[in-house]
Amino acid sequence: MHPNAANSLLKVIEEPQSEVYIFFLTSDEEKMLPTIRSRTQIFHFKKQEEKLILLLEQMGLVKKKATLLAKFSQSRAEAEKLANQASFWTLVDESERLLTWLVAKKKESYLQVAKLANLADDKEKQDQVLRILEVLCGQDLLQVRVRVILQDLLEARKMWQANVSFQNAMEYLVLKEI
């Protein structure tokens, strides 16, 4: 958001003209400016994962894939779109392999990053890989090793969002883990 737009928005929030209610809807509250977040009341709406899992199973996905996709997706439309997308499931398979190797501290993890970087050739796919890894880590938080990987993964995501190349951010993650 441009600074002038943010300032105008803050003025509207702080000095409403009349009985006005303003709603901001976002899939990631961290992307909202801190000054705006500090002047709002935040409500979290939970996804209806169980219903989405049932829908995805009815579409023909096995339970494991349906569960992963329900946790990954931010909407029913996104889940339905990705359910039949072969490229998405390739990213899932390769991300699972990377995480398995990271947990086992295998040096081959470094080679897997190159494979993922080739598959994730645009920002959208790169974001998908990072989100897939976050979901996979979230499924096994009881392991201390997985929690450490998740922390480093979040750091790698911040680097990527700060315009470090995807491959460099992922290589950083691997170097921290092996």
Please place each PLM-identified region on the residue numbering:
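Short, surface-exposed loop and linker segments with low hydrophobicity and enrichment for Pro/Ser/Thr
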Residues: M1, L10-E14, A120, D127
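Conserved AAA+/SF3 P-loop NTPase catalytic/coupling segment centered on the Walker-B
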Residues: M1-L10, K31-L33
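Conserved catalytic/switch belt of AAA+ P-loop NTPases
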Residues: N7-F23
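Charged, glycine-rich active-site and insertion segments that engage polyanionic ligands
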Residues: S18-Y21, T26-I132, L136-I178
